[in-house]
Structures are given as C-alpha cells and as structure tokens.
Amino acid sequence: MSIRFLKRLRAPLYIQNAYCSKNYFYRSFIQYYSPSNGPYLKISMNKAPQSLGLCTARGDSPTNQDRMAYGYLNNLKDTTNRDSPFFYGLFDGHGGTECSEFLSTNLGKIIENQDLNDTEKILKEVHSVGGYMAGLKPPFSLRTVLQSRDEDLLWRARLYYSFLQADMDYLTNYARPSPDSAVPGAVGTVAIITSKNNLSYWESDSYIIHLAHVGDTRALLCDSRTGRAHRLTFQHHPADVEEARRLRRYNMGFSRDSFGQKRFAWVANTRSFGDGYKLKKLGVVAEPQLTSIHSLRDDWSFLTLLSDGITDVVSDDEVVDIIKLSESPQDAANNIIRYAQNVGAVDDITCLVVRLPGWKKRTINDFTKNLRLEKSAYHPRRS
C-alpha cells in the first residue's frame, strides 16, 4: 500500500432521500453470479444497502445544497479488457444548488469521455480567464502523459483535466453575461475504484482507489486490521501553509472573519468549482488534490465521503467507529447523519459509505464510545 497520511445550531431532526445523478441510475448496479457459473443477477446500487450507503439531511438553510453521484464509467471499458471503473462523488454546494447539481449530473460523464489528446484546448480556455489562471501549470507534462503506460499517471491526468473542464463548462453556462459576478459554487471529492483484472473491485484480490478533491469535503478509509481512520484529503483553506504560499505569490487578499477564522477574499475555501471568474483570477481554482492508493483485498473495510457539515462536529475516529459498528453501509450512513444532528450539526450533512472487500474482516473495536456518550449527553437535542 502507498498512501499519504495527513495530520491535519441546529439541524432538522429528519433524514432526506439522497440526491443522486439520475444519469447514472440506469448503469449503477452490482453483478452477482446466480447460480454458480450461471447468468448475472443485476441489482441497482441504490437498492443494495449491503454495498452502498447514502444519506443526506438539510441544515438550517431552506434547501439542501449537497449532491451525490455514483455509477459505472462504461465508456472506459471499451478501451480495456477489465470491468468498468466505478465512480463515487460527493459535492457540497454553496450559494445555491446549481453547481453541485451540475457536477453530480455531468462530472462523471466528463471523466468518462476525457480525451487526453485534447487537454491543450482545456488549458487554453483556463489560461484565457487571466490573472492566476493565466499561469496555471499542470503537475505533469502533456508529452509524458501521452507517452506513459503508467495507469496511476493516466488516471491522475484524466481526473485533473476533467476537474478543470467541469469548472470551465459550468462557468460558461452560468457566469455569462456578467463574467465578474459571483455565481453558486461547490467543493467536492471523487473516488474512482478500479481492479487490476477483469473482475469488479469487490471481487478482486487487489484494487486501486484514485481520488480527486477540492475544498473541505472529506474522504476516509478504515484499516481492517486496526480499525483506525485514515484521512485521504486535506482542506483547501487559507490557514493551510501550502495554500497560503500558493496564493501569496499573486495577491494578499487574506483576512479573518468575526470568529477569527482565516479567509481568502470572501470565501472560506481556496479551491472550488464555480464561484465566478473574479475568484478564478485570484486563485480559487478547481485544480484537485490527487491521490492513488494501491490496496490488497483485505486492507480496507470501507471508504466514506463526507460533507463538512458532518466533519465540523464529528471527528474522523468517531465516523469510522460508527460505521464499522453498523450492520450495513446504509445503516452506517443513516447512523452518521443521526449522530451529527444529535451533536449540533447546522450545515447540510451528507454521508456516502462504500463497502470495500475487507468489510467482513473489519476490527470491531470502539475507540470513541465514551466521547460520543459525553457529546450526546451534553447537547440538548439527544436521541
């Protein structure tokens, strides 16, 4: 395994159905052999609680601006002999639902259809925005990517350019004819899971998780052997040293809000989709953090994607303990939402739980039981 470990009042008491991309429902299923060596049995993912858990709830705002999407990237199977890669995405909107809705509907298709031979066109459009964007340089050369047979590099490039293209496509549709005006934006995390053979990742002895991330959503893995949480993403925030260094090369638009939190321009996140061309020129880009994790079958019990409405009030260890003590991924997602509401979540809260091959091997130890009891007892709204 290779992985980068990072050290880094009031919500309605009900649970809404998950908002998911309808475009992926028709191809979102698990295949089972039934009977042995017989025909495939296909079960829709949103009706497979033992494999995928989805739950979301509105915060204090009038509408829930979080969105989720999942499904096979079927077009990519045409170029390989392997099972289709699977796509999971969580998008946390702000200023409206337009951007998170756009991403849940379109980002999977953009990733699926991304032609790396056309990336110069994407960069040309990005550079035409001006300001910070005019000097944006990919973390890898196009020539290296086109000549490479390294699947990790090819996936990182596909995700990198897909995030940039989605950002430009959204702004083209929503930021005209007033290009300098603010428009709704979103942050998000996408996980692509592939296997190294022609089996689905849940049947394979080894698999790879490719992650792309902007903003303050979060991805966690649970180690099957130790039961511990491993964070895969970090928050793109003005307080982050690397982000502050990146932005200070071009401007000094840092300030603090009334709570003492560091902000850049008028936003809390230094990377996001949408938000208007003016912020793009200042450096609030959709350039993603990219991570690839090579895993053996029993390494990880589950992957979870979370919006910051949860992580603001629930620690990583609490999240992982609640999930691993649940009977199924769907029960786990429901339990996370209920607990976040119980301990004072005020923002929209969304949880997506993906069962990984090590689910049955997970270590059932509860490191945060006392902490959760104390927090639940302290908060006036307790279940």
From Swiss-Prot:
It holds the Pfam family PP2C. Its cofactor is Mg(2+); Mn(2+). Binds 2 magnesium or manganese ions per subunit. Mn(2+) 2 binds at residues 92, 308, 347. It comes from the Eukaryota. Mn(2+) 1 binds at residue 92. One of its GO terms (molecular function) is metal ion binding. Keywords: Hydrolase, Magnesium, Manganese, Membrane, Metal-binding, Protein phosphatase, Vacuole. CDD domains: PP2Cc. GO terms for biological process: cellular response to oxidative stress; positive regulation of autophagosome maturation; positive regulation of vacuole fusion, non-autophagic; regulation of aerobic respiration; signal transduction. InterPro entries: PP2C, PP2C_BS, PPM-type-like_dom_sf, PPM-type_phosphatase-like_dom. It catalyses: O-phospho-L-seryl-[protein] + H2O = L-seryl-[protein] + phosphate; O-phospho-L-threonyl-[protein] + H2O = L-threonyl-[protein] + phosphate. Belongs to the PP2C family. Has a role in the regulation of vacuole fusion. Monomer. This is Protein phosphatase 2C homolog 4.
